[in-house]
């Protein structure tokens, strides 16, 4: 056998051996500097025990995509390949719903009806501008259930390129969240507190609807605490989380004790508090003014014991959302967006899962939150920009502020905390205090 034939046979045998070994020892490598193709442990945990297929239809397909959205398609494909590499039951297809002209309009109507809102894009090509419609959505189906997965994460004021970059960072969460909805049945329960003149259902309907995709939701009133405090506490302990959305009526000591003991027994709570009574609608009168006053909810000692103080002051800032007002007389009036210092836009520098990749959040007549030194861990979730000032109450608020030139030097109070997470071992508000009634097995922490 000549040397050339030996070399060829050796090469063939080596290739067969490599192919056999690679088939047995399959491994994907992420060589990107930011490891964006490496799934997080939490994302892997969602699908690791999946035993039947999740089929994903992605509608991000087309011929006339801008380059930014071709990148989004590529990143989506590579991410789903990573999911599929972790569990072969992740199956995906790219579909162009607009490819066939004869079914184009019907497909648009059907997808829109299912909640997949189309997106209109500007396309620049050869110096010419045109418009394109895309559906940046995916539908994931599992065991006769289907969820919508948005591929675009909107961001206020972002260009198309910035929008896509922001969306790429959000892709893993979007798919992991969608898969979790399909795989994990609802287990936890949330109580929406009623009875202290909280927001009416119509004002929190969208919020509650979104929560309902993950949790069981039910209203809960503390009215029975006067006659049946022990039963009220037992009933509320059945919930994993309570939400009090903008209460406007003070809490009684009896109600506070039940809420305090709920916390002592491991219950979680979300408090959406306005410490100042002021509504934008109240300014739409002949004078364009109204008075902002302190709203006493009888919760000062409650929050103080847990490590925060919500001050009855309004935050005024140069970095805020505008107010829309009709300017001019009669038929000549026009709606204009005007600078309005009482609607701060709050963001976060934290990478905490609650606020990671969260857009700016608009507040109205927001109040300053101080944190106090104790053993409770405090995470600042939302903060204003640094150009702020604090306005005490009572005080008159007027729409005329939109016509006044603001002095930036007076906005010198720095970043203000508008949302904070408290974690740790809490001590009872009623520890070493006379309680409004006796409770069996009351806890001090």
Label the predicted regions.
Residues 4-249, 256, 274:
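Juxtamembrane extramembrane loops of integral membrane proteins
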Residues 173, 184, 200-445:
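Acidic, S/T/G-rich, low-cysteine, solvent-exposed domains in lumenal/extracellular/periplasmic regions
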